[in-house]
Amino acid sequence: LMKRQGVVVDSVSLGEIERALASGFTPGLHNGHADIVFTADLLDRATLARVVELNIPVNCGSMDMLDQLGAVNPGHPVWLRINPGFGHGHSKKTNTGGEHSKHGIWHGDLVRACEKIKSNSLTLHGLHMHIGSGVDYTHLQEVCGAMLKLVEVVNAQGLDLHAISAGGGLSVPYQTGEPTIDIAHYFSLW
């Protein structure tokens, strides 16, 4: 059902990649679209070998990942997971942006990341930003504004973007009476 509805698997481990494959999701890019993307801040040898073998786009959360991929598979499709310098979540544990977060390439290093993409002959597919889980619309609007500025930086570096992602983080009501997600409002922010 999820595959038929166009859901993309954002895997964060080799095990999740294998589960997605076992569930019928197809690796690689198809008409510019991927069923599976791998997101991390580092690559171990086994995961690196598997994403290269299957041509799974990698959402790179560190500069080292760009060098690792470029060394073994020039042309590999990548996303850049950018830390915009701010984060928000329903608790400190779910805040994945800002100076205290380990996640993502710091927004001020985007030009250097673009240079690494070019020097490693990688193919930039998109920009990704995830500031936390349990995010409200005010903070998501901040993400949208930050993303537009980052797109301008990438364009100024002569790289093409095919997609942008504000990540997840939408608050989900767990109990009756909690606010529901207004998807139309969320999309209107863009």
Tell me what each language-model feature is.
Residues 166:
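Structured binding elements
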Residues 171-190:
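Anionic-ligand-binding alpha/beta catalytic cores of soluble enzymes and soluble regulatory domains
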Residues 1-163, 172:
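Active-site-proximal beta-alpha core segment in soluble small-molecule metabolic enzymes
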